[in-house]
A protein has these predicted regions:
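Pre-ATPase regulatory/linker segments immediately N-terminal to the P-loop/RecA-like helicase/translocase core
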Residues: 2-55, 59, 100-243, 247, ...
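Walker A/P-loop NTP-binding motif
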Residues: 251, 267-282
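Conserved beta-strand scaffold positions in the cores of enzyme catalytic domains, especially
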Residues: 257, 283, 290, 319, ...
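ATP-binding Walker
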Residues: 264
Length: 635
């Protein structure tokens, strides 16, 4: 949320990007020029050291991602790239249309009825290129510097069709309708905008505001203003911990943190903060406030309708993603404080520190909301492996989040934790509450005992009465295997996202069988989700289920944060003699997985493999043995 007052403009040197072309192995270099704090009285070593460290990390992350793709291009054939999901060929254009936001959309279908479009390397939100299927070189080029004629964003995806929202209204050649291809692009604008934000942070040309001093220079956080009365709250149903969080945010001079465990109503708190801020601004200005969103949907048409920047400049409250906050529409006259009065960043624990500064530089006051026990941002190692960020609070590594840095420095002085959750049955919540939140969250009475059979039209049976179900596969011959292309019902599928992912066909079949039992009991398909822990397993399950149940949500755990369903089925996938569990031992990922379900959580797992992989997993299976309905199915 922002309040506008554009008046200044930033300056600085970002550096340069060098990309060599061709289909041979390539080396990508982004040159960040380290900043010297000696020449500027407002450029403190405590800030320049962090900025240089952050910039080098971002530079390394970006280069690793590009070099990984370059390696794939140099070692995999075009057929292998397609089979691995980085490209799709044999597509035809089924429809072109203008959507409600005046953007052009293209709906693609498989040209052959025996192919399912199940690439998991290209997800909703990915930047892709649409091109002539005959142009093989295009399929083997993934660089934004080698852009084909038509680019867009995947807006929806299913086993039988793909919807792409185009970035421009360019005309698509007629001969593409019968045969075209889609390939994944590397999108490096986020890296550039993070570096621009860090440049602006370090080259700030005036005396440092309290926000900078509190975050980096050891200043004490301060709070002003009277305490809010119960009658002051717009949402009178907020609980006391939620009201305390609103109070902290409204009275903070520079920064406040809101720690929102799963289901605790963090969004309601942020809405109340925005309402309170609007009330305050109305008192000060005596005017009403306009609201707008930035980035998507666009406010432009080919006929020359009003532009995004013009719309935004007429509003005082703006909603934006962090990435769009660094775009032209919100760049304004300055990259610095004074553009807005307050910035609120939701899910701040999923953003790198440099990413948060894209928006945070636009106001003297910052409110961060998130949960450090849920998903962190991910970065690439030099070997191409994905690593979840976050380290110990004391070490302050370059890949930590701004939320984590401030919490580590100031703790409870600037932070409030929401303590009552309104989503999960108490048995579903219990492991996370015990192991991660020190028993500081409790289930509200309205949800503590609710189960599926309490829903209208759902019959009562052993499944719908049980909040927890464990489908135990140990000793059943249901084992994992490495991913690859496969066939379901005679159709070819693409099931890969890179060098290593795992599938478990037995677990996939058990997941679908369990879903069918819930449906037979009257549970609505829209109230059910399947969340596997591996992308290849997602593709496998989509091949089994999406054609029969197109409304059934099937997605990977790492895309499920913030979502909830009445019933959730988790496929753990891993089952092997060596008891290797991979990233199942990532406690934050497991916490997200376990806290999506409201009334019914079914876990499909080989306990002999998974239960010994990590102390958190051990605690989980101890809890399941005590509280769950345990079944020993055979496929």
């Amino acid at each position: 949320m922002y309040a506008r007052n554009f008046n200044r403009r930033g300056r600085g040197n970002l550096g340069s990007t060098s990309v060599s072309r061709g289909l041979t192995p390539r080396s990508y270099v982004w040159s960040w020029k380290p900043v010297n704090s000696g020449s500027d009285r407002y450029c403190y070593p405590a800030i320049t050291d962090v900025v240089n460290q952050q910039a080098q990390f971002i530079e390394r992350d970006r280069n690793n991602a590009l070099n990984e793709m370059a390696h794939l291009l140099s070692t995999m054939s075009t057929t292998e790239l397609r089979a691995s999901g980085y490209a799709m060929a044999g597509l035809q254009i089924a429809e072109q249309r203008i959507n409600d936001y005046c953007a052009k959309e293209v709906r693609l279908e498989a040209a052959s009825e025996d192919m399912l479009l199940l690439s998991t390397a290209m997800r909703i939100g990915e930047i892709v290129r649409l091109d002539d299927a005959a142009n093989d070189d295009v399929v083997r080029s993934f660089d934004l510097d080698v852009v084909g004629p038509v680019m867009g964003t995947i807006s929806s995806q299913g086993p039988l069709e793909l919807m792409i929202t185009l970035r421009t209204s360019q005309k698509i050649p007629a001969h593409w309708s019968d045969r075209c291809s889609v390939s994944k692009l590397i999108f490096d604008i986020p890296f550039k905008r993070m570096l621009i934000a860090l440049r602006d942070l370090v080259s700030y040309p005036w005396a440092r505001p309290p926000l900078h001093q509190v975050v980096y220079l050891g200043a004490t956080p301060r709070f002003y203003g009277r305490a809010l009365l119960d009658s002051d709250f717009v949402d009178e149903s907020l609980n006391q911990s939620q009201k305390d969080a609103v109070q902290l945010a409204i009275t903070a001079n520079a920064i406040a943190l809101i720690h929102g465990p799963p289901g605790t109503g963090k969004t309601r708190v942020l809405i109340e903060i925005i309402r309170q801020q609007i009330k305050l601004m109305r008192k000060l200005s005596g005017t009403s406030l306009g609201v707008s969103s930035s980035g998507s949907p666009p406010h432009t048409t080919s006929a020359g309708a009003i532009s995004n920047s013009a719309v935004i400049r007429s509003k005082q409250v703006v909603l934006s993603s962090l990435l769009n906050a660094g775009g032209r529409d919100l760049r304004g006259d300055s990259g610095y404080c004074g553009d807005f009065d307050v910035v609120i960043i939701d899910n701040a624990t999923q953003a790198f520190e440099g990413e948060s500064w894209i928006a945070a530089l636009k106001a003297p006051k910052l409110i961060l909301a998130g949960d450090s026990n849920q998903l962190y941002p991910m970065f690439k190692n030099a070997d191409g492996s994905a690593v979840i960020a976050g380290g110990s609070l004391g070490s302050q590594p370059p890949h930590m989040t701004l939320f984590e840095r401030v919490l580590g420095k100031h703790g409870d002085k600037v932070s409030r934790t929401l303590q009552i959750q309104y989503r999960m049955h108490a048995d579903i919540m219990q492991v996370s509450a015990n192991e991660l939140y020190k028993d500081n969250i409790v289930a509200d009475g309205s949800v503590a005992g609710h189960v599926l059979c309490d829903l209208e039209h759902v019959e009562t049976n052993e499944y719908t009465r049980a909040p927890l179900v464990l489908l135990e596969t140990a000793g059943r011959g249901i084992t994992e295997s490495l991913h690859g292309s496969g066939t379901f019902k005679g159709r070819t599928t693409m099931m890969s996202t890179g060098p290593e992912s795992w599938i478990n066909t037995g677990e996939a079949q058990l997941a679908m069988t369990h879903v069918e039992k819930l449906l037979a009991a009257g549970v609505d398909v829209n109230d059910i989700a399947i969340f596997p822990f591996y992308d290849a397993q997602v593709a496998l399950l989509k091949g089994l289920g999406e054609e029969r149940y197109p409304e059934l949500e099937i997605g990977s755990v790492d895309t499920s944060q913030g979502r909830e369903k009445e019933a959730v089925v988790l496929s753990m996938v891993r089952s092997n003699p060596g008891k290797e569990v991979g990233f199942l031992k990532d406690v934050r990922l497991m916490n997200v997985a376990l806290t999506r379900a409201r009334r019914h959580l079914c876990i499909i797992a080989d306990s002999s493999t998974v239960s010994e992989g990590d102390p958190f997993l051990t605690a989980l299976f101890v809890h399941l043995k005590s509280k769950a309905l345990i079944l020993h199915p055979s496929t």
